[in-house]
Amino acid sequence: MFFNPYLSGGVTGGAVAGGRRQRSQPGSAQGSGKRPPQKQFLQIVPRGVMFDGQTGLIKHKTGRLPLMFYREIKHLLSHDMVWPCPWRETLVGRVVGPIRFHTYDQTDAVLFFDSPENVSPRYRQHLVPSGNVLRFFGATEHGYSICVNVFGQRSYFYCEYSDTDRLREVIASVGELVPEPRTPYAVSVTPATKTSIYGYGTRPVPDLQCVSISNWTMARKIGEYLLEQGFPVYEVRVDPLTRLVIDRRITTFGWCSVNRYDWRQQGRASTCDIEVDCDVSDLVAVPDDSSWPRYRCLSFDIECMSGEGGFPCAEKSDDIVIQISCVCYETGGNTAVDQGIPNGNDGRGCTSEGVIFGHSGLHLFTIGTCGQVGPDVDVYEFPSEYELLLGFMLFFQRYAPAFVTGYNINSFDLKYILTRLEYLYKVDSQRFCKLPTAQGGRFFLHSPAVGFKRQYAAAFPSASHNNPASTAATKVYIAGSVVIDMYPVCMAKTNSPNYKLNTMAELYLRQRKDDLSYKDIPRCFVANAEGRAQVGRYCLQDAVLVRDLFNTINFHYEAGAIARLAKIPLRRVIFDGQQIRIYTSLLDECACRDFILPNHYSKGTTVPETNSVAVSPNAAIISTAAVPGDAGSVAAMFQMSPPLQSAPSSQDGVSPGSGSNSSSSVGVFSVGSGSSGGVGVSNDNHGAGGTAAVSYQGATVFEPEVGYYNDPVAVFDFASLYPSIIMAHNLCYSTLLVPGGEYPVDPADVYSVTLENGVTHRFVRASVRVSVLSELLNKWVSQRRAVRECMRECQDPVRRMLLDKEQMALKVTCNAFYGFTGVVNGMMPCLPIAASITRIGRDMLERTARFIKDNFSEPCFLHNFFNQEDYVVGTREGDSEESSALPEGLETSSGGSNERRVEARVIYGDTDSVFVRFRGLTPQALVARGPSLAHYVTACLFVEPVKLEFEKVFVSLMMICKKRYIGKVEGASGLSMKGVDLVRKTACEFVKGVTRDVLSLLFEDREVSEAAVRLSRLSLDEVKKYGVPRGFWRILRRLVQARDDLYLHRVRVEDLVLSSVLSKDISLYRQSNLPHIAVIKRLAARSEELPSVGDRVFYVLTAPGVRTAPQGSSDNGDSVTAGVVSRSDAIDGTDDDADGGGVEESNRRGGEPAKKRARKPPSAVCNYEVAEDPSYVREHGVPIHADKYFEQVLKAVTNVLSPVFPGGETARKDKFLHMVLPRRLHLEPAFLPYSVKAHECC
């Protein structure tokens, strides 16, 4: 029992709580007898905190000061309080001389001349009547936090207008027309001499004016208005921070130096240890230093309790936060321990030397008293939820972390805390960051899903939800702190069936968490102080595991390397995708050449988010439309930009005029109003340089020769295909010849690319003008090569790790160029470039295939690469696939041959890879000579830097269809596969296990492999006459065993779990007959924990007739006979892939009334009707649907073995296994005592 004397308010001095005498904090307000006026606040406290074991909440309004108890000492919660736990104070004297600091975060704001900030006249002159101030947050070499306020950077863009004075008047008029709020600004217009990057031309843009505006907020509004009205404008959306970084060559993540500055001791804008003001010309970068100082990090987790017993919802006043755990640690530095690299310590990157806040860096905030949580854990006890949240925010402000991390904190923890503070307790959360609200401080979330919560609440009034937006799309902004949520990081870095913290901890840390169900948390919490300690340990371990993940994955180093390379803030690397990276890099490269980037208005698009703050929002959570073309996620960091895709056309994805039967594409792309699949652009001039329409093919593939290959198959691929095409052929905006533009005199200076539909795009060669894209890529490729060379020589693990992150940043950014030019609603689309890249890549594949066909089978050619022992001698003539192979004993052999005969043929081409089947050469020889073959092809066909590389050799390969194959790689254990059920997250483990066993038999058992080859050459009539080859019986035996396991309940529920991703709000699904949607509805009806958008929803298919929890109601207790579900003699072939349909029809005859509904056959029941939560199935012993699971087994095995099944016009490969499997009847449990065990041979 916890006696809470502060619910009634007004208790002072030595109050007794739980039998413990409370001592007042020395110098606190209690002893004075005077209390400053305090607004009333709502206290919400669980009743069990005061009366052990009791449920419910106590709500009370009080006017007393908020309190906190730390080690039996009472503390008043206020902004000027001294935090009670031990921490290393940073007492800084006056700094003299230049300051060298490392910057990790930046923000910009607009200040006015009458700003209350303590700005000296030297810098206040830049604020007449308003001006931009750029705040650089960072740390000095000695670890002190610093804020550098940079004044004097104006916002500017370019506009074509003949009269300078008249344009100034136009700007003034437009300033009165832009949307509110409108603020004062100063403007200057000067002539400029620049050349547009779009289209080849040597003449500057005529009548170009540079419009410079002191106020970035108004500059953006005016520029957008001019763009909307049709004015030719350039670089309108470039914010002042980007201008400073590019114009002054400053880094957004790295070391800088400020030589002349004013020290701020009074009237500070930030809470940093050091704050200085400087002019834009006083800030310089320190190049060639990628080291890090020591930065403070915070990992935290929250625990909530629902008043209704369901999953907590922040908007409900009874769903309170009961505990918050925090782990304080440091990252950066110059040693392995500093960087979090295991080096003789506990492997977590946190030692006693790194603890800077608290006894051990571990903190727990809890409502009520709490037992012993752990040694040296600092526990803070609060009388109510409001005081708990206020204490945590004050702790956050005092600790002032540079990096904040957690697991799913973007979409749950931070959102939950801010929602409670803002909407329930009316607390301005933005005053807890490193900048006050008036100085541009922000502490909020940006979510793209509008009205999601309201829609969800309307759909499920009895349910709650914790994530109203996709995790990857939710953006968090805290001025001076960078948020790195490890949940989307893990999703981007790993390929896992689920991304729960426990799963990631096992994968990365080899640790398992002590799980505590969200249903058990309230029971333990209200039990007593020891129960709250148990919940506290559970809460704290999550924060500790996330800290360890943070230090193991080291994503912050990757993001920092990209921020430094792309010249954008670290926050934009994490949240804003790849488009902004390429745009800023291109802007920087063009600035050196006096090129400018045009803007193009597309109706319906929104302005990309920037760092600027003019008016801080009052709400902590903001929902707006996603930014087209730049709505990114952490996953974008680790993936190559995929070829553009759109919905297939009516011609099955082949563009008009292709006229080729040997290849196809996965998508057709077009510019103009007729584009398909929702991909389109406005009818302006930025699509094709005046061309009316452009269509092109992407992700080109050669149709595979489907089948099972027991011969070696070599795979060759192009290294960095798309970047190398840009560099080799000088493709760029600046080299594109546009109608009406300049043309070279000599036709030999023009490189032409003709698409399948006859449209031709032309580019000037490098001898006329070097491509800006090509030079930028060349610089990065050379830089990456130099970094990798340094890695090979580097012995220091810290330095080597930083170099590795740098080379990875270079690789990822290079590969993003193709997507940058091809995204129609991107920042600078140019489909002629993207179409040309795709066309050239297609031609390269075709030329490679033709060269292989013409040369690789010729003895003279092979003699230059292979020795006599590399050949397979004695190949039977009957082994060719053209010959028919009957079962054993019926073949007609033509005898052997000692001729060294080699046959090479391209059997598949996929975007940048070529698969070549070799007959007559050993796999070992191909592995040894493959690089030489690739080098020879490159030398004969391509120009630098295009390079064909040897990748691997399949000893045997099952080519199923496009993008789907399985093979055994020479020199590697296991199988390499793509696009099959074994690597799909949706398939259950049982199906994967059976399929894996079948494939193991096929690739590891020589008899089975030979039987598969023979089977592929048989007709269906021959199979009916002679049966399947003997070696294939082993596969059939495994399938029979799987069938028996299912019908006799020998399979664990865990191995039968299926899953689907909840990709959007459940109310936005048009189909209600989806299994995972049905499961969510059943969970909501039972008030159970619901998945977040982006999570996988797990379910099991149960036996038909079992009454699971109905949608909108709870279980009615109907019982089902436990045992085996009856099964007909033959396996029903009904296609149950479709989740919809299958609704029973009333059995009517003429005008007769409806009779009793006919019962569906078991396999005809739709999946959504029998889908149920796995935990519910285990707890209630619900039998599984054996029919459906065995049907899935047969489909999965058919998918991987169908190339070897007999073909023909009358053969149905999907029914082949049904035909050859022996039939078996599985009895109901009541008949089992009367059955007789029999032996059956398969």
UniProtKB/Swiss-Prot annotation:
Show the SMART domains listed in the entry.
POLBc
Q: What is an example of a GO molecular function annotated in this UniProt entry? A: DNA binding
Record field: compositional bias (Basic and acidic residues): 1145-1155
Query: Where does this one sit in the cell?
Result: Host nucleus
Give the start-end ranges of region Disordered: 14-38, 644-665, 877-898, 1108-1163
What's the chief localization of this chain? host cell
Pfam families for this protein = DNA_pol_B (PF00136), DNA_pol_B_exo1 (PF03104)
Bias (Low complexity) occurs at 653-665
A single GO BP: bidirectional double-stranded viral DNA replication
**Which EC main class describes this enzyme?**
transferase
Which keywords fit this entry according to its UniProt record? DNA replication, DNA-binding, DNA-directed DNA polymerase, Host nucleus, Nucleotidyltransferase, Transferase, Viral DNA replication
Show the InterPro entries listed in the entry.
DNA-dir_DNA_pol_B, DNA-dir_DNA_pol_B_CS, DNA-dir_DNA_pol_B_exonuc, DNA-dir_DNA_pol_B_multi_dom, DNA/RNA_pol_sf, DNA_pol_B_thumb, DNA_pol_palm_dom_sf, DNA_pol_type-B
Q: Name one GO cellular component term.
A: host cell nucleus
Q: What is its EC number?
A: 2.7.7.7
Keyword Transferase belongs to the record: yes
Q: Which SUPFAM superfamilies match?
A: DNA/RNA polymerases (SSF56672), Ribonuclease H-like (SSF53098)
Catalytic activity as recorded in UniProt = DNA(n) + a 2'-deoxyribonucleoside 5'-triphosphate = DNA(n+1) + diphosphate
Q: Which residues lie in Polar residues bias regions? A: 1110-1119
Q: How does it assemble?
A: Forms a complex with the ssDNA-binding protein UL57, the DNA polymerase processivity factor UL44, and the alkaline exonuclease UL98. Interacts with the putative helicase-primase complex composed of UL70, UL102 and UL105 proteins; these interactions may coordinate leading and lagging strand DNA synthesis at the replication fork.
Instruction: Please state which protein family the record places this protein in.
Output: Belongs to the DNA polymerase type-B family.
What does the UniProt record say this protein does?
Answer: Replicates viral genomic DNA in the late phase of lytic infection, producing long concatemeric DNA. The replication complex is composed of six viral proteins: the DNA polymerase, processivity factor, primase, primase-associated factor, helicase, and ssDNA-binding protein.
Record-given protein name: DNA polymerase catalytic subunit
Organism encoding this protein: Human cytomegalovirus (strain AD169)
Question: What's the gene?
Answer: UL54
